[in-house]
From Swiss-Prot:
The protein, known as: Regulator of chromosome condensation
Gene: rcc1
GO MF entries: guanyl-nucleotide exchange factor activity
PROSITE patterns in alphabetical order: RCC1_1 (PS00625), RCC1_2 (PS00626), RCC1_3 (PS50012)
Organism: Xenopus laevis
InterPro entries referenced in this protein's UniProt entry, alphabetically: Ran_GTPase-activating (IPR051553), RCC1/BLIP-II (IPR009091), Reg_chr_condens (IPR000408)
Length: 424
């Protein structure tokens, strides 16, 4: 990523609706990243939906099998938050449904039942990527700006979004001077990857997931206050010799972060109490660690997804791996599996394109468009129709999957979202 210049912008006063009027001093580039969705499809949801996160209306509180969500255009990305869902349309518009207590839907839901079905977020800019956490949502525009709505929380409650103790019910712009090319959300933290290969983080840092805040300051920012946490700041990681490490990709677990350097090295920071980062010990990492457990593979890593205490990942050869906590079958390594401190191949899977995880569940999407699921069955997120835990990968079936291929999966606290399209 050479020759990119930092762009300076003049930021005008925020309008009363909460969005910023940004006067650009030069034309901004169209940002690209392999993670941006480009193939349009339909959205299926399953699991528990008592606060509307399934998007199926007021009368449907759960679905044992994937159900079709009614949307007005093709969807190129679907992201599951803790208790809400975010869909990105092919036009660049955002549709949300689910819990709006902290503003994670980014729209007015005062009309009874309006949060239970998809509604459009008012944002003039064309969006190319979305991410969702427990009670926040982020949107990346085609010119590299980031808008957020909702709030971050820590163990004591709401901490705010961009300002201390202030949530936002509508999109507000993140002030960062360099175009962003990818966004990723954990439960209560946000990571921005810039065109220059830098990582900016914001949100809760209690478990080290921001990668830039020492442990003594993670409790609401210490004497510097919440601004230390909520204002996105760059992670400065020195490289061997001179300069610093630059990154090409980033992924979030619930309370931890993975980042891949431009040289292909895997770094991690945050909670690792079950070795979910691939560290030898179970201490939290408050600064990026070069994870040697991922060097044991000669392949390049192309995808990571972290639950509460486990991680699933996939390499460039289409092989899926898991590590971390084993209870309830979330690793997919069989009923007698134990905690894993390094990436462990998941048996009985075909060639895989992508992986996903919820708190205690995991998914893998094969190159031929099938989805496999395993882990805790309590919330009906696995598509088996039963509440039993699944210890090894099982292919998900259902009426709406018979003639459709799965493009991607995203999983929240109690529900799961599939992006699918008709098989040609």
């Amino acid at each position: 990523m050479k020759g990119k210049k930092t762009l300076k912008r003049t930021i005008a006063a925020e309008e009363s609706n909460g969005t910023s009027d940004v006067k650009k001093t030069k034309a901004l580039p169209i940002v690209t990243h392999p993670s941006h969705g480009t193939v349009g499809g339909q959205v299926l949801t399953l699991g528990q939906g008592d606060v509307g996160q399934l998007g199926l209306g007021e009368d449907i509180m759960e679905r044992k099998k994937p159900a079709l969500v009614t949307l007005t255009e093709d969807i190129v990305q679907a992201a599951a938050g803790g208790m809400h869902t975010v869909c990105l349309g092919a036009s660049g518009s955002i549709y949300t449904f689910g819990c709006n207590d902290e503003g994670a839907l980014g729209r007015d839901t005062s009309e009874e039942g309006s949060e239970m079905q998809p509604g459009k977020v008012e944002l003039a800019e064309k969006v190319v990527q979305v991410s969702a956490g427990d009670s926040h949502t982020a949107a990346l525009t085609e010119d590299g700006r980031v808008f957020v709505f909702g709030s971050f929380r820590d163990n004591n409650g709401v901490i705010g979004l961009l300002e201390p103790m202030k949530k936002s019910m509508v999109p507000v712009q993140v002030q960062i001077n360099t175009p962003v090319i990818k966004i990723a959300s954990g439960n209560d933290h946000l990571v921005l990857l810039t065109v220059d290969g830098d990582l900016y983080t914001s949100g809760c840092g209690e478990q080290g997931q921001l990668g830039r805040v020492p442990e003594r300051f993670t409790n609401r920012g210490g004497r510097k206050g919440l601004e230390r946490l909520l204002v996105p700041q760059c992670i400065h990681l020195k490289a061997k010799g001179s300069g610093r490490v630059h990154f090409q990709d980033v992924f979030c677990g619930a309370y931890f972060t993975f980042a891949v350097s431009q040289e292909g090295h895997v770094y991690g920071f945050g909670l690792s109490n079950y070795h979910q980062l691939g560290t030898k010990n179970t201490q939290a990492c408050y600064a990026p660690q070069n994870l040697t457990s991922f060097k044991n593979s000669t392949k390049s890593w192309i995808g990571f997804s972290g639950g509460q205490h486990h991680t699933v990942c996939v390499d460039s050869e289409g092989k899926a791996y898991s590590l971390g906590r084993a209870e309830y079958g979330r690793l997919g390594l069989g009923e007698n599996a134990e905690e894993q401190s390094e990436p462990t191949p998941i048996p009985d899977l075909p060639k895989i394109n992508s992986v996903a995880s919820g708190a205690s569940v995991s998914y893998a999407v094969s190159t031929d468009g099938c989805v496999f699921a395993w882990g805790m069955g309590t919330n009906l997120q696995l598509g088996t129709g039963e509440e039993e835990d699944v210890w090894s990968p099982e292919q998900m079936t259902g009426k709406h999957l018979e003639d459709r291929e799965v493009l991607s999966v995203s999983s929240g606290g109690q529900h799961t979202v599939l992006l699918v399209r008709k098989r040609s």
